[in-house]
Amino acid sequence: MAIGMFLPTKIQNPVEGCGKESYNPKSFWHPWGDHKHRGIDIFARKGTPVHPAIGGIVVATAHNKGAGGNCILVLSSGLRLHYYAHLSEIDTHAGAIVSRKSIIGKVGDTGNAKGKPAHLHYSIATIIPQGDWRWDPKFCTIFINPIKEME
């Protein structure tokens, strides 16, 4: 487990074919209702493939009508949890080992994104402060700015 702390943690944009123009670089930790936006929204056409930002193990998938809608949680090196939300489809399952080339889902507008432009909400949580991070007392969680981690 300790060796996992020292493996690479640099990530790729998880939405296939998307670059810096697909998200607002100031959206991380931007005021969002009664809290802060804990990640970034990457806008793309509905159905665009979503890849893991970095390889890891899928620890959970969920289909719900509120919040993140169809979502996936992947554990990676550095003890980081990568959250992918508002997916139109989930193409993986809990326990799957995924690489950057795997397709885990498709961009969508599920959950509280219904009726809004299709996008992937992507965030990174951790138990170890690393890089550009913020503490969220509401969830007692450390969130890392994904933009600063992308290659």
What kind of region is each of these model predictions?
Residues 1-71, 100, 109, 146-151:
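Surface-exposed, glycine-biased beta-strand/turn segments
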Residues 6-14, 93-100, 118-151:
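Acidic, glycine-rich catalytic/binding loops that coordinate metals and/or anionic ligands
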Residues 44-46, 89-90, 94:
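Active-site acidic-Proline motif in GNAT/NAT acetyltransferases
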Residues 47, 77-79, 110, 125-129:
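Solvent-exposed coil/turn segments that connect beta secondary-structure elements
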Residues 52-91, 117-121:
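Zn2+-dependent peptidoglycan hydrolase active-site motif and core
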Residues 103:
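Glycine-rich acetyl-CoA-binding "A-motif" of GNAT/NAT acetyltransferases
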Residues 107-120:
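Active-site loop architecture of trypsin-fold serine endopeptidases
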